[in-house]
Structure formats: C-alpha cells, structure tokens
Amino acid sequence: MGSLTFRDVAIQFSLEEWQCLDTAQQNLYRNVMLENYRNLVFLGIAAPKPDLIIFLEQGKEPWNMKRHELVKEPPVICSHFAQDLWPEQGREDSFQKVILRRYEKCGHENLQLKIGCTNVDECKVHKKGYNKLNQSLTTTQSKVFQCGKYANIFHKCSNSKRHKIRHTGKKLLKCKEYVRSFCMLSHLSQHKRIYTRENSYKSEEHGKAFNWSSALTYKRIHTGEKPCKCEECGKAFSKFSILTKHKVIHTGEKHYKCEECGKAFTRSSSLIEHKRSHAGEKPYKCEECGKAFSKASTLTAHKTIHAGEKPYKCEECGKAFNRSSNLMEHKRIHTGEKPCKCEECGKAFGNFSTLTKHKVIHTGEKPYKCEECGKAFSWPSSLTEHKRIHAGDKPYKCEECGKTFKWSSTLTKHKIIHTGEKPYKCEECGKAFTTFSSLTKHKVIHTGEKHYKCEECGKVFSWSSSLTTHKAIHAGEKLYKCEECGKAFKWSSNLMEHKRIHTGEKPYKCEECGKAFSKVANLTKHKVIHTGEKQYKCEECGKAFIWSSRLSEHKRIHTGEKPYKCEECGKAFSWVSVLNKHKKIHAGKKFYKCEECGKDFNQSSHLTTHKRIHTGGKTLQM
C-alpha cells in the first residue's frame, strides 16, 4: 500500500459548494485542513507546503484552488493552454475538464480552440482528448445542459445531474464500511482512501497499530512533542483541537447553557456532564466496588483508591497522593498560598472545598439531620462522623498499639504520639506542633483574634471548637456515657479521659522525670514545672502564671466575675472548683476522712485544718 499524502486527506470545494457552507462550516473546514497538514508534517509524510495550505493560512477562499494545486507534483503541461494536469488522470478526461473549467461561464459556442493552434495536430499533448471533445461538442450541441442556479455549462447529461445534486443536498452514495453518506462519488472515494489506510501506522514503542490521526496522537505521547502553542499564555498542546478548547479559557466565553438551572459552560462536554446532576444519571460504574459516577474522570480518580497508587509526590516533604489536585492543594501548606477567599468575611483558604464548608457558617444552614437523635449538621461528613457515636463503630486502627478510632483524622493525630514528630512550627515564637490545626489555633494567641461568638451569652472565642464546647454548658447535654459507672459527659474526649480512671492507663509520660499522666493536657501543664516558664502575664497587676487557665481564673479577682452559679441556692463563684466544693454541702457527702480519729469532712481544706489538732497546731509536712 502506498504511503499517505496530503491529497488523500484534503477535500476540494467548488465555488457553488463553498457558497452552500455557512461561516461556522467554512471555519471548521479551514481548521481541519490545517490540522491535517500539521499532522502529516509531524509524521514526516508531507511534501513541500501545498498551495491550498498557503491560501488557508492567508485567509483566502479555497474554492478557486485547482485539484492539482493541492500538492506539489511534476505536472503534465498542455502546450496550448499552459494548463497543469494530473499525470495519473486520463488525458482525455483532463483536457475536457480544462476546457470546461476555462469556459464554464461562456455559452457552448465558445467551447473551441483559440489562437495558438492552426490545427488539432499542433496540440499534441491532448490530440486524442481534443478530437473526442470536439466530436462530442459538434455532434451533440443540442444536448448542452445548463444549471439554472449558477449558469454552469455541462457537455454530458450525467455531469449536469451530478452537479444539481449538490444543490438538493441529497446524499445518494453510501459507504459500506462506515454509516456515512455522500452526494458526490468523488467524496465517497475520498472517504474510502482514509479508512483503507487504517492500521497502516505502527508505534515503534509498542508495535500498536493506528489510523493516521490516532498514530500521531499516540506518537506524541512518547516524544512529548507539543507543537500547538497558545499565543495568549504560551501553554503548548499535542493537538490543535485541544488548543482550540484551551483558548476559550482566555475569552471567558460560555456558549453552552443548561436549560434546567441556567448555568453556562465553555464546552459542550461539560454541559452534558452537568445535565447528569439533574437527571441523577451515573453511567460510569466501578467494577471493583460497584460505586457509580456521573463523570468518567471521577471514576478514573476513584480507581486509584483500589489500586493503592499514589503517583503524585510532594518534592518538599515526600508525601504522596493519588490525585494531582490533592498534591496541588497540599503544596499550599508549604507556600502558605490561600487563593480561595470568602466574600462575606474576607477569610482565605487553601482549597475550594474548605471555603464551601466555611460559607455555611454565614448561612447557618444545617440540611443534614441524624435520624437517630434529630441532631442537624452543616456538612454530610459531620453527619457521617456523628452516626458512629450511635453505632459505636471504630474502623480506624493503629498498627503500632492496636488502638481503634472512629475517625481517620483522629488516627492520623494519634500516630504522631508514637513518632514524636512535630513538623508544624510557629514563625512567631518557634513552638512546634504535631498537627497543622494545632499550629493554626496557637497562632491566635499572638493575634488575639476571637471570631467565634456565643449567641446565647455573647462570649467570644478564638476557636470554633471552644465555642462548641462552651455551647454544651447552655444546652446541658451529656451524650457520652461511661458503661463502667454510668457517668455522662458532654464531650467524647472527656469520656475517653474518664475511662482511664477505671483502666489506670497513663499513656503520656514526661521525658524529664518519668512521671506519667492520663491526659496529654496534664503532661503539657506538668512540663512547665521543669522549665519554670511563666509566659501568661496579668496586665492589671503584673502577676505571671504558668498556664493560661490560671491567668483567666486570676483575672476574675479584678473583674469580680462569678460565672459559676449553684442551682441549689443561687450562690455564685469565680471558679468551678469552688462551686464543686460548695455543692457537697447540699449533698451532705463527706469524702475527706481523718485517719487519726475517723472524723469526716466535705472539703479537703477542712480536713487539713482539723489535722492540726492532732499535730499540736503544726502544719503537716508533705
């Protein structure tokens, strides 16, 4: 089989055919022809640039291009008309076409030889063809057929009929190989040339066979060549069609509009995908787990979960991801970039999904409701996590110690206890943290910002978690119950800490003195004893404290604030510990017993005072 040439993939239009096309079709023709030529050049097939391509690049009309001008091949020259002809065509047919094309707008009486040849013998190249043409014209002058639409003259009835078919738009010729129809035999022949060459190109990399356009695309995957460059931003592409799609980004044009919701898209494929959200259609199904998706790209991304593949690696810290979008979002942690800004409050975020979640704070919307207890949530993920409280599920297990967790985020945080790693450092004071969220919370200490306000009492907090914790005081809810002793807690973390009283577990150990604690907060507080650091200072009197909680309690001395009220008698206290002691008076309970005489007391301070009786007024040395 001969090699592919530009003539095999080029399509010729006459003036009347060209005028039947609308502007969009003409532009499509230009783009297709130019891309076909570029593809042939890339494959090393194309000869010197054909005149048709030069015309198209210059924006000229291609209809007046002669068929033989499509490629540069050695022509046969007619000495009389100096007309280039196809060598492979019959000269007889060629000469007739030359005469008819030259005089197509004249009457049939003008179809004769002009100056230059005294007789037929002098036109040696086309002698036979001329004789036949002359005979045809002289013997059948009454059978010259005229096209009423464009006044073209045809010397055969078949030619006239064939020409008229162009105006009717009928496509009588059908390709058996593909379901396509054509109105002209030449167009059908043209089409056949393309499909007969299918699989004639083989990839040297894998020996895979392709048709000519697929071969080009496949070849570019291996070479990495991207010849189609965007003049606007310099981005390069392997195919001209992809470049055309890309250009829409710069223009911002959105021609494809959803009739259902009015949303517009730059590409028709995006609109088709979008429509599935209204229809609920999910045609792309995962063979592994049966989960269905509305987009093929989402299915492809999903499949990496089963494969365990993580091809996208962060050059900064080495962390790997199964999606490029996740890597891009992760990189913002290192760069500090926050491109997604909330129009309501100006707060910026590293990714769009976090911004979307944040926006719910302003609307107060909670569309996701728990069927078990009726509690509502702003996000579906929060509802899913909440449901585990009722189910008691703990699907996430630590391979190091075997401990199980309800949430993957809690397991991730837990793992750092074993490694002792603290990758997140505060630029302000140099303090390091195990999680990014802990660093974010810490930074508020330096800024003093308090964005989260309680609608019930007006109190403001630096962190949303603190506000959530605070709200439980007003609600009086205690959802988390200890199965061992029945004691209930407002927060799951408090229940977990409480359980350690029964188990005696003390997982948090001080590296300095070896003392162990059941709570990480207690270990943190304890460590300050070794450093002697008192970083929390009272602005009123200058007194310094090791812990921020002590400073907060101390400030009440100056303000006179007593937020802790006894429900029994109405008496108020500055500190919760004092309120707890006070409540024992009403309960009549006496937890503190003197080992010397057996007397009971409801407060430890009363027992300490009592003991002085036995010691003779001397305070016991502990």
From Swiss-Prot:
GO biological process: positive regulation of transcription by RNA polymerase II; regulation of transcription by RNA polymerase II
Alphabetic keyword roster: Metal-binding, Repeat, Zinc, Zinc-finger
PROSITE patterns: KRAB, ZINC_FINGER_C2H2_1, ZINC_FINGER_C2H2_2
Database matches in InterPro entries: GLI_C2H2-zinc-finger (IPR050329), KRAB (IPR001909), KRAB_dom_sf (IPR036051), Znf_C2H2_sf (IPR036236), Znf_C2H2_type (IPR013087)
Name of the molecule in the record: Zinc finger protein 728
UniProt KW Zinc-finger keyword: yes
Zinc fingers (C2H2-type), renumbered ranges: 228-250, 256-278, 284-306, 312-334, 340-362, 368-390, 396-418, 424-446, 452-474, 480-502, 508-530, 536-558, 564-586, 592-614
GO molecular function: DNA-binding transcription factor activity, RNA polymerase II-specific; RNA polymerase II cis-regulatory region sequence-specific DNA binding; zinc ion binding
Domain KRAB intervals: 4-75
Any one GO cellular component localisation term in the record: nucleus
